[in-house]
Amino acid sequence: MAAIVAALRGSSGRFRPQTRVLTRGTRGAAGAASAAGGQQNFDLLVIGGGSGGLACAKEAAQLGRKVAVADYVEPSPRGTKWGLGGTCVNVGCIPKKLMHQAALLGGMIRDAQHYGWEVAQPVQHNWKAMAEAVQNHVKSLNWGHRVQLQDRKVKYFNIKASFVNEHTVHGVDKAGKVTQLSAKHIVIATGGRPKYPTQVKGALEHGITSDDIFWLKESPGKTLVVGASYVALECAGFLTGIGLDTTVMMRSVPLRGFDQQMASLVTEHMESHGTRFLKGCVPSLIRKLPTNQLQVTWEDLASGKEDVGTFDTVLWAIGRVPETRNLNLEKAGVNTNPKNQKIIVDAQEATSVPHIYAIGDVAEGRPELTPTAIKAGKLLAQRLFGKSSTLMNYSNVPTTVFTPLEYGCVGLSEEEAVALHGQEHIEVYHAYYKPLEFTVADRDASQCYIKMVCMREPPQLVLGLHFLGPNAGEVTQGFALGIQCGASYAQVMQTVGIHPTCSEEVVKLHISKRSGLDPTVTGCUG
């Protein structure tokens, strides 16, 4: 035993990490990688255990290939960590949608009395109960992913991987043990993490991000959300919806990259339903008070004046950065965009190194959306191992922002269509409508709005659809198929609606912005 310990110790007397080299046949991984034409350990190695990476790995395994996944979650600055599944499962789509649902249920409970239900008021929300239920569901998904990998004989390594050369990575697990892996093909699918404003004193010490909010055991209380991204507005929306005092501070326009008329309606609805907005403001300092509350100092950019407010929680939602900095990409020869550190890829998802690929949020110019990463991952595996040549189509990708009044869209925004084709060649059909469910409950529907962006010349190809209202994701998904197939305005108008639904208002759009007529829908059977 003493001899083993002595062998593990170097001249410094410290323990060296053990290296476990996985082999195929008699040659080690490092030898296989360095020898020209040497056998590799795996047909495919996926770095990153998020939605895109797992989809790619499972598809390749289904096609009979030897596959490995290397995944490791670096705890957030607040110490939050989670299991296999990536951002969407753990700190994104899934917990966000469930907490959004919790907020919607609060509104339904308030509506219930209008429908004859005798509900004691005021209704109280229990953050602990909600958080525990959401976290338990997330953990079940973590376990499900592990089982799926095992069932498909995908080798899983919980290691922080980085490149040694273009065919080899090494990774360190949380115990400090080093594992070295080689593969013929490597897919980078490491995703991204929330950005901290390092120029704001106290931001890192006292703030949290979307990596933390869904794993809080106690209610965040009075919350300041800093940012104008969809993450900022979604989080602020459900926090307000469950009864918390919530303020959004944003430097410039909300939902940059989305249709700006729709973005304005989203924030108008949130503001009219209790979320406060500090527009054109930037934080400069956060300090913790003796009461454990956070005192935030900010500047109004228009006036140059400073102001101060006190909050229980500050949530940063100012954007995301790709997880590429610790991959040692230069050792593999993989090129990144120096401005944002995203990996440059071609239509095949290939990087500057032909057998190394990148998919999902880490890839330059790709939508940061779970479904696109999943589809791109599956198609990549099919091209590599299934004799397919089908490329991912990144045009007309639908998405939904799960704010209190949901915003679904597919295709071009009005601004994009005008910039691409010119104002004189664009026709926009639009309508304000009131969901039937809002009528009895006497809910405000002034921001429920639809617009369809079309070419003006026949056959009036539909370029984009924008829907603001209940169940926007469900509505948009169906129309996305038509737009992907090249539907015209005339074809949409020939479609019979399902009555009474919100989605039928799309197939009844007949007033154009150019006409100047009132777009408000009156009656329910017109």
UniProtKB/Swiss-Prot annotation:
FT transit peptide: 1-36
Gene Ontology MF terms in the entry: flavin adenine dinucleotide binding; protein homodimerization activity; protein-containing complex binding; thioredoxin-disulfide reductase (NADPH) activity
Disulfide bonds: C88-C93
Residue(s) carrying N6-succinyllysine: K81, K177, K331
Main enzyme class: oxidoreductase
Keyword Cell membrane recorded: no
GO terms for biological process, alphabetical: cell redox homeostasis; heart development; hemopoiesis; protein-containing complex assembly; response to hydrogen peroxide; response to hyperoxia; response to oxygen radical; response to selenium ion
InterPro entries: FAD/NAD-bd_sf, FAD/NAD-binding_dom, FAD/NAD-linked_Rdtase_dimer_sf, GSHR/TRXR-like, Pyr_nuc-diS_OxRdtase, Pyr_nucl-diS_OxRdtase_dimer, Pyr_OxRdtase_I_AS, Thioredoxin/glutathione_Rdtase
EC number: 1.8.1.9
Binding site for FAD: 43-72
Cofactor(s) the protein requires to work: FAD
Function: Involved in the control of reactive oxygen species levels and the regulation of mitochondrial redox homeostasis. Maintains mitochondrial thioredoxin in a reduced state. May play a role in redox-regulated cell signaling.
Subunit structure as annotated in this protein's UniProt entry: Homodimer.
Protein name: Thioredoxin reductase 2, mitochondrial
Species of provenance: Rattus norvegicus
Chain's gene name: Txnrd2
